[in-house]
Amino acid sequence: MSFTVIIPARLASTRLPNKPLADLGGKPMIVRVAERAMESGASRVIVATDHADIFAACAQNNVAVQMTRTDHPSGTDRIAEVAAVLGLSDDAVIVNVQGDEPLIDPSLIAATATLISREVPMATAAHTIDDIADAFNPNVVKVVLDKQGRALYFSRATIPWHRDGFAQSREQLPTAYAPLRHIGLYAYRNSFLQAYPQLAVSPLEQIEALEQLRVLWHGVPIAVHVTPHAPAAGVDTPEDLLRVRRYFTQ
């Protein structure tokens, strides 16, 4: 399947200033992310940014980059603008890779892209939770699926709630209980991506602070690729940055 990867990147970060430009083994983080995406088999990889410094860093490292407006409320709106500028067809598949994932598995990008079909215009990924602390951590977003592997709901709460298992103990995951952790990787059919910014914000999205709930609330199916392996963690804190720097200097 042919697909395009678009990587939204903003310079502002409350916990880690100038994160996209952080040096990782001699290259900016955003360049490292793009290089991983290039290994996915994507027909095109392009960075979407509203900052001249990120644009310059990409250009200096031969990474395709497109300037965008500065007023986008989300990364999804930003990649929708770039897809429109590129003149991609309605049926084109676009994958949104986060700009702070320099260790993302290229095969995960490709597997998520392949789930897009005429019936399912959006896809994402998940993996099995094996740590009870993650099951109860509201910063770990959970997802439950239907029999077709499509998302029924995303939540910061522990879903599904194993009534009998948790009645016995909340110190360990119940037997035969496999909660899924959502991975923030998204693929779209371009026709839906262009319509997305016009979708009204949903009450559930506001309650949970999860943008993907807007899609489900409007009745649009989301396919979910379940990977057997937990993905490498992204870079959100100075500690994360040190960990990833060690990887690139080995």
From Swiss-Prot:
GO biological process: CMP-keto-3-deoxy-D-manno-octulosonic acid biosynthetic process; lipopolysaccharide biosynthetic process
Pathway, per record: Nucleotide-sugar biosynthesis; CMP-3-deoxy-D-manno-octulosonate biosynthesis; CMP-3-deoxy-D-manno-octulosonate from 3-deoxy-D-manno-octulosonate and CTP: step 1/1; Bacterial outer membrane biogenesis; lipopolysaccharide biosynthesis
EC number(s) reported in the record: 2.7.7.38
Protein's UniProt keywords contain Ribonucleoprotein: no
Pfam families, per database record: CTP_transf_3
Species for this entry: Herminiimonas arsenicoxydans
InterPro entries: Cytidylyl_trans, KdsB, Nucleotide-diphossugar_trans
Domain of life of the organism encoding this protein: Bacteria
Name of the protein this chain belongs to: 3-deoxy-manno-octulosonate cytidylyltransferase
GO molecular function: 3-deoxy-manno-octulosonate cytidylyltransferase activity
GO cellular component labels: cytosol
Gene3D superfamilies: Spore Coat Polysaccharide Biosynthesis Protein SpsA, Chain A
Entry-linked SUPFAM superfamilies: Nucleotide-diphospho-sugar transferases
Catalytic activity: 3-deoxy-alpha-D-manno-oct-2-ulosonate + CTP = CMP-3-deoxy-beta-D-manno-octulosonate + diphosphate
Location(s), subcellular: Cytoplasm
Family that this chain belongs to: Belongs to the KdsB family.
Record function comment: Activates KDO (a required 8-carbon sugar) for incorporation into bacterial lipopolysaccharide in Gram-negative bacteria.
